Amino acid sequence: MTDRDPLLAPFEALIGTWDTEAKHRLVDEVVLGNATFEWLEGGHFVVLRSHNDHELLPDAIGVIGRPESGEGLVLEYFDSRGVRRTYEVSLEDGVMRWWRNHPGFDQRSYAKLGPDDFEFVHQLAQTPDEWQDDLRAVYRRRA
C-alpha cells in the first residue's frame, strides 16, 4: 500500500467481509446477503461490493474517495438495476454517514460502527424533511 489518503484512514475499520440481514419497507421478510469493503491498490479508494438474496434488493458496487473537485469524500454508487448515484460520505468518531440532496428523492444513511457489527439505517424523503426508513441492515463481520 502506498500513500494511503489520510481522509480515508477511518474506513480501515470496515475492511473485510460482512454477512448482512436487511429489512426493506417493501419486502415482508428479512433478506440475507453479504458485503465486502477493500482498498483499491494504491490506497486512494475504498471499494464496496454488496449482494442480496432477493430480487427487489439490488446487488451493488461503490467506490469511496475524494471528489474530482471540492472537499470531503464521495461514494460513487452503481447497482444491478442500472442505477448510478453520487453520495457525499463521512466516517468520523465511528459514525458513518452518506447522503444526497435530490429534490423529490433525498437520501441519507448512518451507522455507528462496532468492531464486529453495526446497523445501517437508510432513509428517504420524497417531500422535504419528511424522512422515512427505507432499509435497515445489520452487518456482522465474517470470522
Regions found by a protein language model. Give the residues of each.
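Hydrophobic small-molecule pocket/channel-lining residues, especially in calycin-type beta-barrels
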Residues: M1-A143
